[in-house]
Structure formats: C-alpha cells, structure tokens
C-alpha cells in the first residue's frame, strides 16, 4: 500500500504542473456566502440563504439547511430534527446532524430521546457519543465496565460524555481507584494534564491541589514529599516522575537511581523507568534502551523495593505506544548486542493482541526469533516459526510485506493490473449524488465538507466501484481523493 501511494505521489508534480490555474474566487456563490454567514454566526442571513436555496432546489441546499439548524441546535426541539431527517434521509448531512443532536441530547441529559436516536446513527464514529450510549446502557442495568474503560482510556481530550461516564461508574463502584490511576498515567503519558488531573480527582478531590503542584513543578513537588508513603502519595509521585521525564529523561533517571526507584513499589518504580525510557527514545537518546531494560529488570523483581511484600501486578500497565518505543530503542542498539533482540521480543510480547498483529511487529518479532534461535537442530523450531510469521505478511502489499518477502529470499512484484473499467462502471459514480455534491463543495473551496461528503458516499462500495470513484476523482484532478479512494482497494490494485 505504501508503494502504491508513493507511485501516485511521484506522479503528482507532473500532473499538477499541467493543471489549469486555480479558478477565480467563489465568494459570490450563495453556498459560500451561507458558509461565511455561519462563520460569522449571522443567523438572519443564514436563514434567508437556506430559504432561497431550498426554494431553488439547489443541489447543496441540504448543506445550508444543516448549517442553519446546527447553528441553533441548543434551542432546537425534536420535531425540527425529525423533519430534517425526512427531508434529507440517507445523506451525509442527515447522519452528521444526528451526530450533533446526540451530543446535544447528552449534554441535556435527555436520555429518552438519546436512546431513541442512537440506533439510527449510521457512522457511529464519535467517541463522546459512544460514552453517552454506554452510560444509558449502564442506567439500564447492563455491565459496561470493560467498554467504558476502553472508551475512557482512548479519549484524546476531556469531553462531557466520557468524563460523565467515568464519574458515574466510579460513584457506582463499577470503576475502582486503580482504574482512575491508570487513566491518570495514560493521560500524563499523552500530555493531557487536564484529563490526568480529573482522573486523580475522582479518587479523591483533595488530590487536585497536589496535581496542580506536580504539573507545575515536578522537581519541587518530589522534594517536598518527605516520608509520604501512602498508596495515593506513591501514585502522585509516579506522575511527578513521568512529568519530569517528559522534560528531562536523564534527570528523572538520576532521581530514580538516587532514591525514588527504591522508595516506590516495584510496579510503580518499573513504570517510572519505562516512561523515562520512552521519553529518551522520543528524543533519540542513546541510553533509551538501557532505561527500558532497567524497567523490565525492576518489573521482574531485579531490584529490592522498600516494600518487600510488594510485587508487580498480573497485568502490565504500559501502553502499546510505550512498548512500541521500547522496540524502536532496541533496534537502535548495535546488531551485535544480544540485548537488542531480547528487549524487542519482550516489548512486542507485552503488547495487546491487536497491536501484535500489526505487520511491523510481526516482522520484527520474527527477526528477533531468528536472531535468538539456538544454533543447529535446537533452533529449528524457532526458525520455522519465524519463517511462518514472515510468510503470513509477505503477501501484503505494504512496506513490511516487502521486507518480509526479501527476508524470505523472494522479490517484490507488482500486482496484476485490474481489468479496465467498463463504460457502465465509469458512469456509475457520475450518477451518484453524493459524489456530485462532494466535487461541487471542493470546487467551491469547501474542501472539509467535500471530503466528508465523499468519504460518506464511499461506504459499502465494492472494489470495482472504488476504482471507478477513484478514476472520477483523478479525472477531476482532486488528487487527495484520487489517492485515498484508490488506496482503499484490497484486491483490485491499479498502479497506473
């Protein structure tokens, strides 16, 4: 897939050089004027534009209708939404407005209307809406703990839906302090301090002051900790070390070596080292692999903690992203260093099952297995397993598929060109209103709206239909949609 994108991208300068100059400004177009009215929050002008374009039967009237209603969604009532859905059933704007309305209903805590609307949400790709939906399922007596944790841990920014879900389940006893501390660590790792502060505050509102201090100055916070050894204190100390590591991983490593590596329980000390290693890897520091190995040594009990009874929990609380950076740090070690493949193996094996199935980690795990296999007959089983893993991804038309093919001694060949599109196949996307609207929006300079309309229209298309849609975009010189749509095919691959 990367090879196909590269070929298309290399062709772009040649084609773009021959393209016509950009069209004149479309600022006088009524749809563009309506979009400008939305930007200015000019409700009267937007309402007038909506009425005029609806009366004319303009092909983009539905977008102006959407802008007008979404601009006053806070005061809208269900009958208005129902009428909109009836006018534009099956279109992108219908589902887009339903998405917006579900968010509004969640903020209103109108769970009856939310529960009625949610099953009709076709895209179902909004994480906050998913959190609201899980909350309604919890209210109905369903066990949503696992799904709620997954949604909460995956949120990028604090939003009402996922924070409400977390706080509700925490108050109900369905989430525990360990869950909240894990969210605090994940948020700190992702540099989302507000989310980390919220999670710590769930455990105890009094933690808010400590979180503010450690976020502002982790060095000073740790210096003031003295003999605080409660479990909550130790969690806060770990967060401070993570914050410190993000600024200066070597300094944080020094703090762990000097005292904190012994003062914290094994699991927390190991996690601190793991985050020091990730931050060092992000900065491409040569000692990153050493820090990662130190994390595993502590996790395995290689260092005696201050609390002899403490031991690592069964589940490793490190993210897939952190483990991926451990692999990258390992691969920067010299090929002759045996710890290179040991660290890579350990990190990949600790990833989630879904992450381990990614071609990159299948490839590097196989390479590690080959490198660590015993010589002679004792290593035959390991080498056979590595070869089978490489064969499993060698058929993929991707970067790591190519590397696997070469590792197996083969040569990468381009896939056979698909049969030419028939006249009927080429005509089909031209008759699709969604594609027509998308191209018109892009031509007007409303690219964001056009791309969303285009992608929605691609839903459910087969391989040949995708090729035809890609061809239409190429002919119209909408190059990002040309490449993106072509890249969606799995079997019908056109490299021309």
Give the label of every model feature segment.
Residues 5-13:
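Bacterial N-terminal signal peptides
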Residues 17-496:
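Cell-wall glycan-active module
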